[in-house]
Amino acid sequence: MIPDVSQALAWLEKHPQALKGIQRGLERETLRVNADGTLATTGHPEALGSALTHKWITTDFAEALLEFITPVDGDIEHMLTFMRDLHRYTARNMCDERMWPLSMPCYIAEGQDIELAQYGTSNTGRFKTLYREGLKNRYGALMQTISGVHYNFSLPMAFWQAKCGDISGADAKEKISAGYFRVIRNYYRFGWVIPYLFGASPAICSSFLQGKPTSLPFEKTECGMYYLPYATSLRLSDLGYTNKSQSNLGITFNDLYEYVAGLKQAIKTPSEEYAKIGIEKDGKRLQINSNVLQIENELYAPIRPKRVTRSGESPSDALLRGGIEYIEVRSLDINPFSPIGVDEQQVRFLDLFMVWCALADAPEMSSSELACTRVNWNRVILEGRKPGLTLGIGCETAQFPLPQVGKDLFRDLKRVAQTLDSINGGEAYQKVCDELVACFDNPDLTFSARILRSMIDTGIGGTGKAFAEAYRNLLREEPLEILREEDFVAEREASERRQQEMEAADTEPFAVWLEKHA
């Protein structure tokens, strides 16, 4: 089932320096909660400055949903320590609140009013909050409070030059973009390995169902927790953060211009369903527009091609301008066993897997084959640890045992690991391979199995509160290592100044400005 990568691996072993200079970055979301696990109703902590313009700490959907962002980094340890510093400073500056350590929220009552993230009075800030109002009215606020980790990854120019020859200008844009689309297609075909290993949401609180019927065969504990015994990541299931209305958009990942055209079409295509919500009610705007996507960021995807945008530029226009610059992996649940929601083992595994995805052949995929890849993902998400589970290739009928496919993949990853270790020194990547490959013969070692054991004992709420309390105490005590207190104070002041400048620079009323941007 795994493509034959032997020639590409032999090429890599002859060109190990092609992997010198991999760049990455991390984003981690987490809900602010009270000691009893309920959602914090306070505003964004003052010490964290402006959520609109802060470089490292912002908010996602809700005012209580923090998002930590590391700068681009070539050093894994430095990046993780930077992320930990963001958590340490925040833990010391959120009064009696904690950071929820799980992807799935728990103590949120049906119909509870969840305050949307607030970004001040600038047109840009108001637009961001209105976008979130649209998300709430389309999908419900509860779904939007699910948290995850995003891993951003780029291969060095040396890799593309070794692989594609001496490239520059438009030629580089085309070839590098084609290379990253290969990564994305392989990710759709084989990325289910990520929830298998690291999925950590095998259960949900009963409040999450909100009384809606479900066809999933949940088991229920006495404390009202619903779980699937072999599930890995309900966050990635249809119960979690996915979007059925987008499944027939037909967006493909074969060609830059085709992809961008599909995305631009989706933000112009009217939706009958969303038109029923209306645009405005009693003088209050309900969504930016009633199209299938309000803006491009609404497209739900487990992986995204990205380029840093310039001021006023849409993500797709940035891609058209310069091609794909990096990949954003979006299938990681919060790691409940780490105070910062992600750890070194995961980052090293993702490095290996992304390099493998760049090397393995990836035939072009139609939108129907893309839909077929979802079958494997759903199997792993809902019953990934089930004995005897099999997976298929695309829309073909042949089935292969998951443990065997996993071990075949890791045989390749071990060779990538040897190459990365040869240029970085040590055996850190090979050690990760040895640790993780054991999960295929013993699913009890996976994150989902480990966290489910705790959840069955103490419930999701009990597990979440215990981890949150332990991490709060730990982070508050740890000294900063890379950033200093004065760096945070300076960024707080600079972010507030940037927000004020944006507000002062606006000359048009929001309604007029919105007509041009909706």
Swiss-Prot record:
Reaction(s) the record says it catalyses:
L-cysteine + L-glutamate + ATP = gamma-L-glutamyl-L-cysteine + ADP + phosphate + H(+)
PANTHER family per the UniProt record, alphabetical = GLUTAMATE--CYSTEINE LIGASE
The name under which this protein is listed is Glutamate--cysteine ligase
One example GO MF annotation: metal ion binding
Enzyme class, first EC level, given as a word: ligase
Q: Does the keyword Ligase apply?
A: yes
Q: Which UniProt keywords apply?
A: ATP-binding, Glutathione biosynthesis, Ligase, Nucleotide-binding
Cross-referenced Gene3D superfamilies: 3.30.590.20
Q: Pathway of this protein?
A: Sulfur metabolism; glutathione biosynthesis; glutathione from L-cysteine and L-glutamate: step 1/2
EC number(s) of the enzyme? 6.3.2.2
Q: Which family does it belong to?
A: Belongs to the glutamate--cysteine ligase type 1 family. Type 1 subfamily.
Q: Write down any Gene Ontology CC term.
A: cytosol
> Is ATP-binding given among the entry's keywords?
yes
Domain of life of the source: Bacteria
Q: Which GO terms describe its biological process?
A: glutathione biosynthetic process
